[in-house]
Amino acid sequence: MSDFYADRLFNALERNEVAPGSLLVAAPDLASPEFSRSVILVIEHSHATTFGVNLASRSDLAVANVLPEWTELTAKPQALYIGGPLSQQAVVGLGVTKPGVDIESSTKFNKLANRLVHVDLRVTPDEVRDDLEGMRFFAGYAEWAPGQLNDEIEQGDWYVAPALPSDVLAPGRVDVWGDVMRRQPMPLPLYSTHPSDPSDN
């Protein structure tokens, strides 16, 4: 690897492995406006593909207008989030289980990390109501071809970090990207208030 990307912030830190349930935190200087200050929760990671949803992009559309039957389980703000640029007509459901729920043997959701699950939306809300603390719904997703994400991580575009249930169910007033940056190793907390447009700084 050349030294071309050596001065990127994330390249100075120890690299964590990507896995379902990990976060891809966008670099403060990420050139792509589509992913500026994004926090991607990885849902699947394999040799064939990696895909996930952006926890930090809320739309103005209410879940009640799209999936009214799921409104009661949706954490506030009860809005549909923009998961990514692909297949925005498809909805992805993420949930946080209540403590003590047996995730491993469930056919209603797939475990991502700790109490984070990918919910099968073919089930009814009544089938999972007793298992979940709350849910978040996403229109579309982000996806990487084989080797693409690894290249972007090596370039310093993304920092891989563990996810917390609070990242998925964060209240509307929370800056998810800044919140995640604040709990990472130094010097990342120093960049937690970095604006999406540096000219605003």
From Swiss-Prot:
Entry-linked Gene3D superfamilies: VC0467-like
Q: Which domain of life is it from?
A: Bacteria
SUPFAM superfamilies referenced in this protein's UniProt entry, alphabetically: VC0467-like (SSF143456)
A cellular component term (GO) from this record? Answer: cytosol
Q: Which family does it belong to?
A: Belongs to the UPF0301 (AlgH) family.
Q: What is this protein called?
A: UPF0301 protein CE2927
- The organism named in the record is Corynebacterium efficiens (strain DSM 44549 / YS-314 / AJ 12310 / JCM 11189 / NBRC 100395)
